[in-house]
A protein has these predicted regions:
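Transmembrane helix-loop-helix hairpins at membrane boundaries of multipass inner-membrane proteins
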Residues: 1-7, 17-117, 193, 197-201, ...
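Hydrophobic core of alpha-helical transmembrane segments in multi-pass integral membrane proteins
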Residues: 13-18, 39-50, 90-95, 295-296, ...
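Hydrophobic transmembrane alpha-helices and their helix-loop junctions in integral membrane proteins
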Residues: 95-105, 113, 119-138, 148-454, ...
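Short phosphate-coordinating micro-motif centered on Lys-Gly-acidic
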Residues: 143
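Hydrophobic alpha-helical transmembrane segments of polytopic
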Residues: 5-12, 31-45, 82-89, 115-122, ...
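Hydrophobic alpha-helical transmembrane segments
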Residues: 75-90, 209-224, 418-423, 517-540, ...
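Cytoplasmic/organellar membrane-interface segments at the starts of transmembrane helices
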Residues: 244-245, 376-381, 433-531, 546-581
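Juxtamembrane boundary at the C-terminal end of a transmembrane helix
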Residues: 584-593
Length: 593
């Protein structure tokens, strides 16, 4: 079975190559159908391998197996978390391709295979990163998915905003990749190894961590946290989501950002969790401090957005912070909770972006103010947006609710309050949009670009062009079926008995500590906190709609909004600041050693 692991990468790459070569001669329906078939086949393969992933599968590509414990071959590891992420990537890619069939206009120059080919390469890069067993090839897959993501973000190259957003994305993430590569070089200089497990063993044999190990940890983590859009590396994400096509946003927020979090978990657990790596107390401090800052920043910025796609992007940032806090507990419960949380969040967030895309193609805007009351006819879409918002809030029985429940119980203390408030605020922002856009509730907002100093830093969603090339008179069934199925999947992740426990055990079985039997189930406290965050979200949204001036105080968030300047130089400066902060937070590991 392990010999099938390379196919998770080879199949989508081959499909992309064939579409790129023959796309000019294929009808769009055939090209899109072929891409969907490749993604569906890859998803089936990932699920098949996942069912046989205990014990973990290993494959040395090309037969380059270790000799005397050393190898220069490419190691692929098929354990529960890696194959689970690969399956999630394939399923979400299939959803994005199916959605794009009617949401995007005709391909440029008559090349029907161009967009689906890029999406398949993106899928291959993400799957390769998920199953990479050595650090250098993880970097290679990291770069492949990054480069393709830049191209997909700037797909509408005729628009200056798309190019600018893609450029900011590319520059910041490329610098993060350089940091990752330098960290790999330092670790290789110390250990002479590239396989993740071998690096960890070599560091443990060397003794307590020193400045070189600290530098390697900080640089590797910087690259991964840039991809995860953690504070203060997050500035590229809202700019990219504002201009990227909706199917691309579904993948960026649904799974690519989560792969950055997955990389943080994988690298720390396999490489740095031993006596030669970073002590547990220092790792906990790094992850929880950054996680808390990310959650608060994302929630505050999410609340003050009127551009719906930017609002959803900041929501992703906020929930990334919650993921990092749970990882920072360094417990099997925290890891299992995050894994289930990621699955539920992927379905909910991709569905919400799909609904935002429907608004853009139907009304030519994603501005909450401009769309006030205009989407009353879209009752089905309204129901899905409300359901997605409640999923973000953690309403049982969504998978997000069960995962969040386990994670917040593992974190405990003040972090429980942060989980409730962050999920409530991000959900309330989406509910506010639903009430105004689909029901026309509340006073009519003032014209976009109004007065006030804060408006200079406010990004509206007006003036957008429909991605379908023209405003849709009727929303195609595929564009509504995709978010409906995604929400159903997110609901099933929490409602299907035993699914959460299976996810948690798959994660714990892949850790260096070995299998820890954890049971993920609903508890009275978890259900109560989920209901509390949902009720709080509804209350906040109701006040925001009925009394806009009471909670809408943009001046309080003005310092944060000014930081989102759109200037690449500012974003690079913050990347350097973030790297320094990581070093300061981890420094006690060296001083105590």
């Amino acid at each position: 079975m392990h010999h099938l692991l390379p196919l998770l990468v080879a199949v989508p790459l081959l499909g992309a190559a064939l579409l790129a070569a023959t796309g000019r001669h294929l009808p769009r329906t055939v090209a899109d159908g072929a891409a969907c078939a490749v993604s569906a086949g890859s998803a089936a393969l990932a699920l098949l391998l996942l069912a046989h992933s205990s014990p973990p599968l290993t494959e040395w590509a090309g037969g380059w197996e270790p000799v005397a414990g050393h190898s220069v071959g490419i190691l692929l590891t098929g354990d529960g978390p890696g194959l689970g992420m690969a399956a999630l990537v394939c399923v979400l890619t299939l959803a994005a391709l199916a959605y794009s069939r009617r949401s995007l206009d005709e391909p440029p120059h008559g090349h029907a295979g161009a967009f689906p080919a890029l999406v398949l390469v993106f899928q291959a890069g993400m799957c390769g990163f998920a199953i990479a067993g050595d650090l250098f090839n993880a970097f290679v897959w990291f770069e492949l998915m990054s480069v393709v993501a830049y191209a997909l973000t700037g797909h509408r190259v005729e628009e200056a905003r798309a190019v600018q957003g893609a450029l900011a994305f590319a520059v910041v993430n490329s610098l993060g990749a350089y940091a990752l590569l330098m960290g790999i070089a330092l670790l290789y200089a110390r250990t002479g190894e590239l396989a993740l497990a071998r690096i960890g063993d070599a560091l443990d044999a060397h003794g307590p961590p020193d400045a070189l190990v600290l530098a390697g940890f900080v640089l590797v983590l910087t690259g991964l946290l840039v991809k995860a859009a953690a504070v203060p590396f997050q500035f590229w994400l809202p700019d990219a989501h504002a201009v990227a096509p909706t199917p691309v946003c579904m993948l960026l927020s649904g799974v690519m950002v989560e792969l950055g979090v997955f990389g943080v978990w994988r690298v720390y657990d396999t490489v740095f969790s031993g006596p030669g790596g970073l002590p547990a107390a220092d790792a906990e401090r790094v992850l929880t401090v950054l996680g808390a800052a990310t959650a608060v920043t994302g929630a505050v910025m999410c609340w003050h957005q009127r551009h719906i796609k930017r609002l959803l992007a900041y929501s992703t940032i906020a929930h990334t912070g919650l993921f990092l806090i749970a990882l920072g507990t360094l417990t099997p419960e925290g890891d299992g909770g995050v894994a289930l949380y990621v699955v539920g969040h992927a379905g909910v967030k991709a569905a919400l972006f799909a609904c935002a895309g429907i608004l853009l193609d139907r009304y030519g805007s994603v501005d909450e103010h401009v769309l006030h009351g205009r989407a009353r006819p879209l009752r089905g879409v309204a129901v899905m947006v409300v359901a997605g918002a409640l999923g973000l809030a953690g309403l049982p029985p969504f998978g997000t609710a069960l995962g969040k429940s386990v994670a917040e119980e593992a974190a405990g203390g003040p972090f429980t309050v942060l989980y409730v408030l962050t999920s409530a605020v991000t959900a309330a922002a989406v509910l506010r949009v639903a009430a105004r856009v689909f029901l026309g509730l509340g006073p009519t907002p003032r014209e976009a670009g109004g007065e006030g100093a804060e408006d200079a830093y406010e990004t509206t969603g007006s003036g957008e062009e429909p991605e379908s090339g023209r405003r849709l008179g009727r929303v195609p069934d595929t564009m509504t079926a995709v978010p409906a199925l995604l929400l159903a999947g997110a609901l099933a992740a929490g409602a299907v008995p035993g699914f959460g426990t299976a996810v948690a055990r798959a994660v714990s079985g892949a850790t260096t500590a070995g299998l820890v039997h954890t049971s993920v189930h609903w508890t009275p406290l978890g259900v109560g906190l989920g209901l509390l965050s949902s009720l709080l979200a509804v209350a906040l949204a109701a006040v925001a709609v009925a009394r806009p001036g009471r909670l809408a105080v943009p001046g309080r968030a003005l310092p944060l909004r000014r930081l989102q300047s759109g200037h690449i130089g500012d974003y690079v400066a913050w990347l350097l600041v973030g790297t320094t902060v990581l070093g300061v937070l981890a420094l006690p590991a060296v001083l105590s050693g």
